[in-house]
Amino acid sequence: MKTIYRIAKTELNTMFYSPVAWVVLVIFSIQSSWKFFDTLERFEKSQKMGQNMDNMTQVLFSGFSGLFTEMQNYLYLYVPLLTMGLISREINSGSIKLLLSSPIQIKDIVLGKFLAIAGYCLLFMAILGLIGVSAYFCIDNLDISFVLSGIFGLYLLVCTYAAIGLFMSCLTSYQVVAAISTLVVLAGLNFVGKLWQDIDYVKDLTYFLSISGRANEMIEGLIVSKDVLYFILVSTLFIGLSIFKLQTGRDAQTVSKRVLKYTGLVVAIFSLGYITSRAPLTFYADMTRTNDRTLTKASQEIVKKIDGPIKITTYVNLLDINYYMGMPYSQNQDFASFDKYSRFLPQIEMNYVYYYDTSTNVDLYKQNPGLNDKQLAEKMLETQDIKLKKLYSPAEISKIINLKPELNRVVRTVEYNGKKTYLRMYDDFFKIPFEKEISAALKRLVAPTVKIVFATGNMERSIEKNGDKNYKTGFNEITFRHSLINQGFDVASIDINAQNIPQQTDVLIVADPKTQLSQGAIDRIGRYIDQGKNVMLLGEPETNTALTPITAKLGLGFTKQTLVQESETNAPDYLVTEVAPKIDSSVIKLNKVLYPIPFLGSSGITITKNTDFKITPLLTTNKQPTWESASGISSVSEDLKKQPSAKAIPLVVALTRKTNGKTQKIIVAGDADFISNAELARQGSGTFQFFTDVFTWFSNYEFPIDTTRPESTDNKIIASTNQVFITKITFIAIFPLLIIAAGAFILIRRNRR
């Protein structure tokens, strides 16, 4: 070890007796400081303008344009300048012969050289660390462990670059060639992860070799053993190759022996890398303050209940618009989207089944008129150069699974302990399911589901249609991730006039019947309520009399006419509601609604008699005067203003009572439109939040899965504008000048000697 340290010390002296080391240090210092403090300055100005800050540590250091993310993209440019002369300088000057003929072991020479460059790279990390220290005094409650995780990841990355540069320096006596060769190898390692991803086994090898994004997890606050070991193994590989290369100059070796040594090293490194990257052997350390990179507590409680094999099968329709997400070349990325779960469930098995069938990909059919599904599939295989072991025809896939209800879209099934559920892709920017959707699917396999049944037969709102007034978006839209069918609920319909309510029903919804309920329907609903089951009743001013036999049983009624308010911008029946004050949280827990919840044409809820239900208003009209009027008026007339008005009229009420050992829950609303397709899609509305809270309550807070995390505490820049500016100047100008002065002093002093 002493020899290694002596060589490292000598190499460091040589490096710092060259202007290159000082210039690189100055450029790195200016570049990193400029990036960080320029961003900090912009956020400080935004904060002064009243913009809320959130999670500032992650925003400034990671993300799309944080300090560590940006510097990761530039580190590869610095390393070749530092490593190009490590060995090539010795080869060019002839001193390599003296080294090889000395009693010093080759491994000591190589390790000493690597230790020197690794020591120099610590200066890069020291600069980033100083920026982190300054951030500690600028940001309230800076997440220190998060910053340290990022620095650790970047250090491993730059040391791996250095090991590669060291090996390339062994191959040539020309320093420029060594630098260029290093850049070429680094580019290759960044690109190799995209090669041959459609070939089994080979794709795992190339994916392992890829250095692209390897430090991302650590930059984002998650230290993963397979990434740490990757950097160590790749560094070991190139250090070993460097030792073998220099040994050929000292020892006479046959070609076969050389090949065997190189092959053995490469195979050993690849084997170790493959083994240690498997899920059961991967370990994690979440360095974020709020464990952002780990499953939430609710999700962890779900996965704890899974103790056996679990299989995820992705059915990929070649004609679907999302087909590429399940192709062989995308599978490694697809596996990565389940990393949070494989951490706790290493036994997850993922399979892919490919088929073709009629799809909803309208553009594909427009662009290829006259081709049937089989011809389209053949064309896709040919033009996209897709190679599949098996592509099922419509007839063949239908024998395996019926995907017609899923519109033949790319979809997954999750199977555990004999139960199966769907996990879908969605028509939004991200497409893939997130923790909320994945955990909901898993919970359906280990816990009872919540079944919502809609009453039909009296022209009620439909969960199958897309019109503005219908209910498909919130309940039964498979392409919308927030629809309840994708959040753990089962949704069905029955003809209430002819069919009994299923025994397993958890919530019965009667939404705006436009004709009178039959006596049979009234009796069925009455018996259902008497059993202590949950109900949601939604009426409209013109048709709510159809619900009177039910609401009367509950001791409630509707106002006789539509509620209206005077407004300069909206129609009179456009009501801006308010969440009722002081709602008892033991009755229902509502999240804070940040946006108004509009009601377009609503009746008020009245109490007609005392019952054993506890009645809790949830939404009311605001504090403006409200009158009753016939529907369809264009303005509030002077005559109407003379009529008695009211304020804070209940529009949605919750009824609760203890029965059969559990709490019965009922919602009655004077407006059936407020959870319609159109209203749930309205921008700037709090309707969807309220809608979700209500059904979370109905499910006893089991679904949707609560994936909220503790609020971040690093939400404020505590440094003033002047302090940020002074710190910026210190790091961008004064600190680099000090480095230049130190470098100049050392270089001049050496020249004088």
Give residue ranges: language-model regions.
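Terminal transmembrane helical anchor/hairpin motif
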Residues: T39-S62, A178-A252, L618, I633
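Transmembrane helix boundary and interhelical loop/hinge segments in multi-pass membrane proteins
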Residues: P80-L100, F114
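Extracellular ligand-binding/catalytic regions of CAZymes and related secreted enzymes
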Residues: A252-P280, D286-K311, E435-K451, M459, ...
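Pore- or pathway-lining transmembrane helices of multi-pass membrane proteins that form conduits
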Residues: V20-I30, Q175-N190
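Juxtamembrane extramembrane loops of integral membrane proteins
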Residues: R278-Y416, Y422-K431, E435-A441, T449-N500, ...
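Hydrophobic alpha-helical transmembrane segments
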Residues: M1-Y78, L82, Q247, D251
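Acidic, S/T/G-rich, low-cysteine, solvent-exposed domains in lumenal/extracellular/periplasmic regions
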Residues: K472-F703
